[in-house]
Swiss-Prot record:
GO biological process, one term: small GTPase-mediated signal transduction
Family according to the record: Belongs to the small GTPase superfamily. Di-Ras family.
Lipidation (S-geranylgeranyl cysteine): 226
Residue sites binding GTP per the record: 44-51, 63-69, 91-95, 152-155, 182-183
Record's subcellular location: Cell membrane
Transmembrane segments: none
UniProt keyword annotations, A-Z: Cell membrane, GTP-binding, Lipoprotein, Membrane, Methylation, Nucleotide-binding, Prenylation
Protein name: GTP-binding protein Di-Ras3
Gene: DIRAS3
Pfam families reported for this sequence: Ras
GO CC terms in record: plasma membrane
Length: 229
């Protein structure tokens, strides 16, 4: 009877431990590894695929329907050779209607992803105001914060923005550049891996046109062995 009672308590304890957040478990077993917050801000006009991109990255599922977004934050705990990161990715809608919120998000951001749709030229043009806002807020420390210009929907044949157009814009803004497809999962995971290992340089290499089965050369050089936990 006593053994049965003990077994029941042990099972309850194990069940509770399984429900503990990964963060608490890591702190219990790896107290020597400091967990750092890393905030990535994703911005773009309505319909460019920001929410779909993040949903694809977080769950591996493609979201077909469009859901208007003001601001959402996705959280993920990552472990890599540099330590343990608490990754916070904020999906922020560009535009003048929520400029105060944008300023707050930019001030706290460690990295920025500027997303446009290759099927609509105006979505690239409208990113300029947000890029200038980042420059204004970060000021002389701008070089410390990686910025990646991302052309989404690269799988769509009806494009208005050529690969070279996006690359040229990235050169002008001195930021990294890559094209992705959230729908076909091209370069989605590589994008966020690159951000975690990206080091800002005075000059930025351009992405070479790549095959679907290959990752960009810039990403390959920056990609570290990170484990999603």
């Amino acid at each position: 009877m006593g053994n049965a009672s003990f077994g029941s308590k042990e099972q309850k304890l194990l069940k509770r431990l399984r429900l503990l957040p990964a963060l608490l478990i890591l702190r219990a077993f790896k107290p020597h590894r400091k967990i750092r917050d890393y905030r990535v801000v994703v911005v773009g006009t309505a319909g460019v695929g920001k929410s779909t991109l993040l949903h694809k990255w977080a769950s591996g599922n493609f979201r077909h329907e469009y859901l208007p977004t003001i601001e959402n934050t996705y959280c993920q705990l990552l472990g890599c050779s540099h330590g343990v990161l608490s990754l916070h990715i904020t999906d922020s809608k560009s535009g003048d209607g929520n400029r105060a919120l944008q300023r707050h998000v930019i001030a706290r951001g460690h990295a920025f992803v500027l997303v446009y749709s290759v099927t609509k030229k105006e979505t690239l043009e409208e990113l300029k105001a947000f890029y200038e806002l980042i420059c204004k807020i970060k000021g002389n420390n701008l070089h410390k914060f990686p910025i990646v210009l991302v052309g989404n929907k690269s799988d769509d044949t009806h494009r208005e923005v050529a690969l070279n157009d996006g690359a040229t814009c990235a050169m002008e803004w001195n930021c990294a550049f890559m094209e992705i497809s959230a729908k076909t999962d091209v370069n989605v995971q590589e994008l966020f891996h690159m951000l975690l290992n990206y080091k800002k340089k005075p000059t930025t290499g351009l992405q070479e046109p790549e095959k679907k089965s290959q990752m960009p050369n810039t990403t390959e050089k920056l990609l570290d062995k990170c484990i999603i936990m």
